[in-house]
Amino acid sequence: MKNKWLSFFSGKVQLELTGRGIERLLNECTRQGIPVFHVKKKKEAVSLYIQLQDVHAFRRVRSKFKCKARFINRKGFPFLLLKSKLNIGFTIGFAIFFILLFLLSNMVWKIDVTGAKPETEHQMRQHLNEIGVKKGRLQFLMMSPEKIQKSLTNGIDNITWVGVDLKGTTIHMKVVEKNEPEKEKYVSPRNIVAKKKATITRMFVQKGQPMAAIHDHVEKGQLLVSGLIGSEDHQQEVASKAEIYGETWYRSEVTVPLETLFNVYTGKVRTKHKLSFGSLAIPIWGMTFKKEELKHPKTEQEKHSLHFLGFKLPVSYVKEQTRESEEALRKYTKEEAVQEGIKLGKQDVEDKIGENGEVKSEKVLHQTVENGKVKLIILYQVIEDIVQTTPIVRETEE
């Protein structure tokens, strides 16, 4: 296969030999190092092929013999190139047509979204437009499907998951939205108790009989709203419903190092564009003869398959970015480390109490410096939801 391609690119010619001394001519060609191949005998003539580069040497050898040689065929890239020069207009037109067809085969012509509500789909298309994913855009100049998926998931709140699949000239997206909990059609009778020890700061009862009031100190499991309403003779069971917030306390232990070593990007980036044929990558843009060394380089690659008329080609476009990074040392004084520890502890508490909770204040109970680290014990004053529902259990008379 390799010799076949070499023969094509170097060019070959077919000769027809007639007359006497043909065998001696072929033997002399072998002695002179002139490759002769595809030798065929036809009655009184012999046809054979030689490389284009050996034509002059063959003529010198043939002049010593009485046989005649006639060129009957020419094959290979040099002759195709010669024909294209003679038909330059056709060649340029064909090249432009091929390039346009190739570009059209690698554009996005449709973005298909399934599983999303109209409002969500509108938000998605706006977001896609902002990040450069739109109709008429070349696929290898866009983000990879994985990065599109990550950008959509992070950029649109009401999406739980989105699958992005590029097929031909169409981007298919399957969406799973965040479902709001369905309203309960029927809720069994229940009480509301305190889920932890607290001081009630806010209380709004929609259903049920209040059994506590604002500023009351309540213990864990204490009844706050009863599901039994009405007089003793005519009691009715209902599903208690209320918003009750109380003041609680969280104890947090945090450790902050005084010195931290980490990597940061300097802003220097080297970008290369390549065509990949399997394991072979050929640079097409971004190569510099003056190579500036990048310290602690980190390389990322984006690979895009190329298509032609719906068929995947055995070649890919690769965008390679090499970023320079350097080690940076972050130092804290003891006071700065304490403030950072308070902030980290607050974030941890906020994650536990949810978005409706609120951290009112904090107090550092204990702080020590050991082995280059500040260790803190912090108490946070918090306002949070203390509602916990329990079923109504009535005592049965024996």
From Swiss-Prot:
Keyword Methyltransferase in annotation: no
Main localisation:
membrane
Sections of the chain in a coiled coil: none
An example GO CC term for this entry is: plasma membrane
GO process annotations (BP): sporulation resulting in formation of a cellular spore
Topology with respect to the bilayer: Single-pass membrane protein
> What keywords tag this UniProt record?
Cell membrane, Membrane, Sporulation, Transmembrane, Transmembrane helix
Entry's transmembrane regions: 88-108
Q: Name one Pfam family in it.
A: YqfD
Task: Tell me the compartments it is located in.
Answer: Cell membrane
Q: Where is the signal peptide?
A: none
Keyword Ion transport annotated: no
Family membership: To B.megaterium SpoIV.
What is the recorded name of this protein?
Uncharacterized protein YqfD
- What gene name does this entry carry? yqfD
